[in-house]
């Protein structure tokens, strides 16, 4: 099984790291081992302590003194051996603890550098290679090298097509049978694929028709969107069916209210009654005397002479002429007064109605008389 360069570098780095971690532990564990304590001088060290204990009475010394000597000798030997071993182990441990981290960090940096160089070389090699255009990835940009390769293939296919045409020639009916239709189809398919890829490579950076249509300014002869996008509504029916506006009665500030009109009418009637009262008085002294007599005497006595005088046709004619002369003057004065009052007060009553009203009111006293 052949390993690639990346796999080899990774394997070597793993081995180095494993060794850098395991070797210091081995060295440190070996330094911790202590050497056996040295035996005391004489033959006492060859025998076990029980033998010393049994042989003690043979000498001329007491057993307590011998036990103390042997104990001191062993303690001295242990202290001496442990002191020397500890000093050597401590110095070795400190040196390895300083070297190993630096060594491991340097190895790690070296591995990273190798991986970086390999990745960079791989990318440059991939740029130099020629890849065929995949049918699914149509929007991929084509490099200049790929474009040159496609142009060469296009030239080769054109040369092959020219050779086929030359073979056919004028007597091509017999030679055309030698060339199969499959080869022609294959060549045509290759030619179409190459031309398609070249067009995609040339026009890939251009805008799409949709973007060009969006960014293009509106021309003067642009007629707008078709009718399907925005329907045209006929508003004639709505205008015909629209109901007429209803005006709400709002009082005109210039017009008088009903109460004010009633008050003015009452005042006008009072003034008219006053005028009629003054005008109804007769100017003839006879009439004044008659009125005074009638006013003084509620029940006057009727005599035959007065009755005959009233029924006299001459008297009646004089009275009729006097009344006819006085009526035009009264009518003119009342007409002017009525027209002036109604103009000032804004009433819509015509002067003819006022004239007829005055005539009726003026003739009533005459009828009563």
UniProtKB/Swiss-Prot annotation:
<keyword id="KW-0256">Endoplasmic reticulum</keyword>
<keyword id="KW-1133">Transmembrane helix</keyword>
<feature type="region of interest" description="Disordered">
    <location>
        <begin position="272"/>
        <end position="295"/>
    </location>
</feature>
<dbReference type="GO" id="GO:0065003">
    <property type="term" value="P:protein-containing complex assembly"/>
</dbReference>
<keyword id="KW-0143">Chaperone</keyword>
<keyword id="KW-0812">Transmembrane</keyword>
<feature type="coiled-coil region">
    <location>
        <begin position="140"/>
        <end position="169"/>
    </location>
</feature>
<dbReference type="GO" id="GO:0034394">
    <property type="term" value="P:protein localization to cell surface"/>
</dbReference>
<dbReference type="GO" id="GO:0043231">
    <property type="term" value="C:intracellular membrane-bounded organelle"/>
</dbReference>
<dbReference type="GO" id="GO:0007204">
    <property type="term" value="P:positive regulation of cytosolic calcium ion concentration"/>
</dbReference>
<dbReference type="GO" id="GO:0033130">
    <property type="term" value="F:acetylcholine receptor binding"/>
</dbReference>
<comment type="similarity">
    <text>Belongs to the ric-3 family.</text>
</comment>
<keyword id="KW-1017">Isopeptide bond</keyword>
<keyword id="KW-0472">Membrane</keyword>
<feature type="compositionally biased region" description="Basic residues">
    <location>
        <begin position="360"/>
        <end position="369"/>
    </location>
</feature>
<feature type="cross-link" description="Glycyl lysine isopeptide (Lys-Gly) (interchain with G-Cter in ubiquitin); alternate">
    <location>
        <position position="202"/>
    </location>
</feature>
<comment type="subunit">
    <text>Monomer and homodimer. Interacts with CHRNA7, CHRNA3, CHRNA4, CHRNB2, CHRNB4 and HTR3A.</text>
</comment>
<dbReference type="InterPro" id="IPR026160">
    <property type="entry name" value="Ric3"/>
</dbReference>
<dbReference type="GO" id="GO:0043025">
    <property type="term" value="C:neuronal cell body"/>
</dbReference>
<feature type="topological domain" description="Cytoplasmic">
    <location>
        <begin position="117"/>
        <end position="369"/>
    </location>
</feature>
<feature type="transmembrane region" description="Helical">
    <location>
        <begin position="96"/>
        <end position="116"/>
    </location>
</feature>
<dbReference type="InterPro" id="IPR032763">
    <property type="entry name" value="RIC3_N"/>
</dbReference>
<dbReference type="GO" id="GO:0007271">
    <property type="term" value="P:synaptic transmission, cholinergic"/>
</dbReference>
<feature type="signal peptide">
    <location>
        <begin position="1"/>
        <end position="28"/>
    </location>
</feature>
<protein>
    <recommendedName>
        <fullName>Protein RIC-3</fullName>
    </recommendedName>
</protein>
<dbReference type="GO" id="GO:0043005">
    <property type="term" value="C:neuron projection"/>
</dbReference>
<keyword id="KW-0175">Coiled coil</keyword>
<dbReference type="Pfam" id="PF15361">
    <property type="entry name" value="RIC3"/>
</dbReference>
<feature type="region of interest" description="Disordered">
    <location>
        <begin position="316"/>
        <end position="369"/>
    </location>
</feature>
<dbReference type="GO" id="GO:0000139">
    <property type="term" value="C:Golgi membrane"/>
</dbReference>
<feature type="region of interest" description="Disordered">
    <location>
        <begin position="30"/>
        <end position="67"/>
    </location>
</feature>
<feature type="compositionally biased region" description="Basic and acidic residues">
    <location>
        <begin position="332"/>
        <end position="346"/>
    </location>
</feature>
<comment type="function">
    <text>Molecular chaperone which facilitates proper subunit assembly and surface trafficking of alpha-7 (CHRNA7) and alpha-8 (CHRNA8) nicotinic acetylcholine receptors. May also promote functional expression of homomeric serotoninergic 5-HT3 receptors, and of heteromeric acetylcholine receptors alpha-3/beta-2, alpha-3/beta-4, alpha-4/beta-2 and alpha-4/beta-4.</text>
</comment>
<feature type="topological domain" description="Lumenal">
    <location>
        <begin position="29"/>
        <end position="95"/>
    </location>
</feature>
<dbReference type="GO" id="GO:2000010">
    <property type="term" value="P:positive regulation of protein localization to cell surface"/>
</dbReference>
<keyword id="KW-0732">Signal</keyword>
<feature type="modified residue" description="N6-acetyllysine; alternate">
    <location>
        <position position="202"/>
    </location>
</feature>
<dbReference type="GO" id="GO:0005789">
    <property type="term" value="C:endoplasmic reticulum membrane"/>
</dbReference>
<dbReference type="GO" id="GO:0044183">
    <property type="term" value="F:protein folding chaperone"/>
</dbReference>
<dbReference type="GO" id="GO:0045202">
    <property type="term" value="C:synapse"/>
</dbReference>
<keyword id="KW-0333">Golgi apparatus</keyword>
<keyword id="KW-0832">Ubl conjugation</keyword>
């Amino acid at each position: 099984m052949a390993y690639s360069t990346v796999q080899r570098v990774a394997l070597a780095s793993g081995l180095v790291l494993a060794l850098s971690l395991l070797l210091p532990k081995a060295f440190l564990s070996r330094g911790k081992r202590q050497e056996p304590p040295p035996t005391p001088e004489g033959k006492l060290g060859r025998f076990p302590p029980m033998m010393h204990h049994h042989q003690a009475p043979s000498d001329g010394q007491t057993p307590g003194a011998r036990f103390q000597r042997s104990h001191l000798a062993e303690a001295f030997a242990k202290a001496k051996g442990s002191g020397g071993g500890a000093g050597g182990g401590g110095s070795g441990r400190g040196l390895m603890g300083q070297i190993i981290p630096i060594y491991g960090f340097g190895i790690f940096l070296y591995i990273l550098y190798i991986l970086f160089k390999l990745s960079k070389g791989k990318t440059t090699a991939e740029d130099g290679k020629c890849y065929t255009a995949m049918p699914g990835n149509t929007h991929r940009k084509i490099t200049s090298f790929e474009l040159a390769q496609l142009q060469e293939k296009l030239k080769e296919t054109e040369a092959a097509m020219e050779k086929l045409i030359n073979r056919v020639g004028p007597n091509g009916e017999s030679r055309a049978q030698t060339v199969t239709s499959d080869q022609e189809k294959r060549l045509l398919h290759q030619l179409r694929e190459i031309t398609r890829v070249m067009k995609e490579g040339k026009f890939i950076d251009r805008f799409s028709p949709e973007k060009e249509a969006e960014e293009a300014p509106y021309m003067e002869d642009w007629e707008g969107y078709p009718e399907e996008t925005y329907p045209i509504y006929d508003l004639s029916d709505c205008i015909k069916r629209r109901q007429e506006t209803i005006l709400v009665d709002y009082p005109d500030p210039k017009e008088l209210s009903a109460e004010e009109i009633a008050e003015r009418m009452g005042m006008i009637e009072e003034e008219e009654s006053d005028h009629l009262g003054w005008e109804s008085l007769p100017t003839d002294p006879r009439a004044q005397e008659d009125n005074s007599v009638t006013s003084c005497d509620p029940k006057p006595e009727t005599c035959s002479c007065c009755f005959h005088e009233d029924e006299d046709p001459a008297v009646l004619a004089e009275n009729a002429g006097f009344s006819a002369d006085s009526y035009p003057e009264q009518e003119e004065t009342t007409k002017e007064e009525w027209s002036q009052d109604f103009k000032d007060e804004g009433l819509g009553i015509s002067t003819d109605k006022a004239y007829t009203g005055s005539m009726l009111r003026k003739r009533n006293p005459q009828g009563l008389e």
